[in-house]
Amino acid sequence: MKTVFTALAAAALSVAMVSAHAYDPKATIADLEARLAKIGAAKLEGTDTAGTKTVPAIFFGDRKVNNNYDVVDAVRKAHNATATIFVKEGDEFVRVSTNVLTPEGKRGVGTQLVRNAAYEAVSKGRQFCGAIDVLGTAFDACYNPIKDASGKIIGVSYIGHKK
C-alpha cells in the first residue's frame, strides 16, 4: 500500500511541476529570449510594413522578424502562450510578429503596446511581469526590452498566459 501511495504522490508531483512550468510567465519569457538569442544578436536594418504602418525592420542575426511568425508560434506550441515581438518606432512599440489575435481573429501586427505599466518598465530598460490587458483579454504576462549591441532599446519581447 505504501509503495502505491508513494508512486501516486510522485506522479501527482510530476504533473504539478509540469503544469506550474508550462504556465510560468518568467519561464516562458526566458524560453522566448533563448530562442531569439539562438538566432543571433538583435539589430535594426531598413524598414518593413507592420499592418498598414512602415516601421524599422528588426533582425535577430540574419533573420528578419517582421511578419515572420516561426518563433512566436513555437512559443504558443511549447507553452500555450501568446507571444509578440515589438519594434521601437519613435516613442511607440509596434507589433511586428505576434500570435495575439485581434477581435476580428487576425494577428495583431501593426498594433501598438498600450501605455501601461509594461510600457513604462520596458521604456526604462526593465522587465515587467504581472496581470495586463492585451487587445481586450486579461493575461499573466512578461515583457522584456530588446536591446542592440550598444545597449539601445530597439524593441520588446512579450509572452502572456490567459487568465
Where are these regions (language model features)?
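Conserved beta-strands of PAS-like sensory domains
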Residues: 59-64, 137-163
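Residue-level signal for well-ordered, solvent-exposed loop/turn and beta-edge residues enriched
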Residues: 92, 106, 150-152
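Gram-negative bacterial Sec-dependent N-terminal signal peptides
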Residues: 1-20
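Extracellular/periplasmic ligand-binding regions of membrane signal-transduction receptors
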Residues: 23-65, 100-104
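Short N-terminal helix-loop-first-beta-strand/juxtamembrane motif that initiates sensory/input modules
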Residues: 28, 33-46, 72-93, 129-131
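Extracytoplasmic/periplasmic sensor domains and loops in membrane signaling proteins
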Residues: 66-80, 97-136
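N-terminal leader/targeting segments
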Residues: 21-22, 126
